[in-house]
Curated annotation (Swiss-Prot):
Organism placement in taxonomy: Bacteria, Bacillati, Cyanobacteriota, Cyanophyceae, Synechococcales
NCBIfam families per UniProt: PRK14634.1
Purpose of the protein: Required for maturation of 30S ribosomal subunits.
Similarity field: Belongs to the RimP family.
Species whose genome carries this gene: Parasynechococcus marenigrum (strain WH8102)
Protein name according to UniProt: Ribosome maturation factor RimP
Top-level taxon in the UniProt lineage: Bacteria
Alphabetical keyword list: Cytoplasm, Ribosome biogenesis
GO CC annotations on file: cytosol
Main location: cytoplasm
Cellular compartments annotated: Cytoplasm
Alphabetical GO biological process terms: ribosomal small subunit assembly; translation
Length: 155
């Protein structure tokens, strides 16, 4: 069950991100850690890669906004990062941005059995997801695809 403050935190982070030319990709509040941790994933609205300076600058601005809003009353750690290895791709933009990157695809086959494939992401359109597995193109019906996750080369 998501933390009750998560919607407010997401709204605040989305607003701060938009003001700085970023998009919010994800947010999590990890209350089981001491101190609790607010993880925020951002990317540039124009598609340019996010670097460490971007994350540091965004962290400062979001940190000030969080303090002003007084949403978190306990000690917390603020972690800012950009999507990378291990991230699940979901939006059309994700699939455009990470074309040619290694991915793990979890899908259901004709027998409704869950299968995992690894290859290079080629394309996702309205009907199919295409990956390159050792030089062969595999087309999967999009409605059979359960998840697509970035992996590291050769993993």
């Amino acid at each position: 069950m998501p933390h009750p403050l998560l919607p407010e935190l997401e709204t605040l982070a989305t607003s701060v991100a938009a003001d700085q030319g970023f998009e919010l990709c994800g947010i999590q509040l990890l209350t089981h850690l001491a101190p609790m941790t607010l993880e925020v994933h951002i990317r540039r609205s124009n598609g340019v890669d996010v670097n460490m300076d971007d994350c540091a600058g965004f962290s400062g601005t979001l940190g000030e906004a969080l303090e002003s809003a007084q949403l978190l009353t306990e000690a917390y750690v603020l972690e800012i990062s950009s999507p990378g290895i291990g991230e699940t791709l979901s939006s059309d933009r994700d699939f455009q941005t990470f074309r040619g990157f290694p991915v793990e695809v979890v899908h259901r086959d004709r027998d409704d059995t869950e299968q995992r494939l690894e290859g290079l992401l080629l394309e996702r359109d309205e009907d199919t997801l295409q990956i390159n597995i050792r030089g062969r193109i595999k087309r999967l019906p999009r409605d059979h695809v359960l998840s697509v996750r970035l992996t590291s080369p050769g993993s």
